[in-house]
Amino acid sequence: MFRPKSRQPSEDDLEVFLPEAKRAQLESGWPGVFRREILPMLWEAEADFSDLYHSVIGSPNKPVAELLGILILKEFHDYTDEQALEAVAFNLQWQYGLQLGFSQAYVCQKTLHNFRGRMVKSQKHQRLFHHLTGQIIDRFGL
């Protein structure tokens, strides 16, 4: 079942627990760039994926932006699904980049697999790729 999500800070966000020096290091590296530049684009695309879910039946969806972010970072790092899900659960860089609190830093492998399957079947991944590529080119003047 699709329920639109918005990124609300949680009580266990990394900003609350990380020392300033570590937070600054994350912010200046790829996690900060991903969080500032890419993740907002994914949140904007959230509603475009509502038709991948049943309107009434099923558990509420994991945020689409989160799943898309995991799939993008998985390819960026050339990880398997298993490695990517482990990074979500235990890697501060991934958690910071995806803006996940400690309690949010878990995705079931079946959830990721099923989402990717529905996305590919609907060909939304192609439209998203072209949309994001255009936004990135505009944003960074490439």
Each model region followed by its residue ranges:
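Basic, short loop/linker segments at the boundary and entry of helix-turn-helix/winged-helix-like folds
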Residues: 27-69, 76-77
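Alpha-helix boundary/capping segments in eukaryotic regulatory proteins
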Residues: 77-85
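A general alpha-helix detector
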Residues: 66-72, 111-115
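DNA-recognition alpha helix
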Residues: 84-96, 136
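Catalytic micro-motifs at enzyme active sites that drive phosphoryl/nucleotidyl and oxygen chemistry
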Residues: 59, 97-104
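Active-site- or DNA-interface-adjacent structural scaffold in DNA-acting proteins
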Residues: 102-142
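Charged, often Cys/His-bearing segments associated with DNA-binding zinc-finger transcription factors
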Residues: 1-42
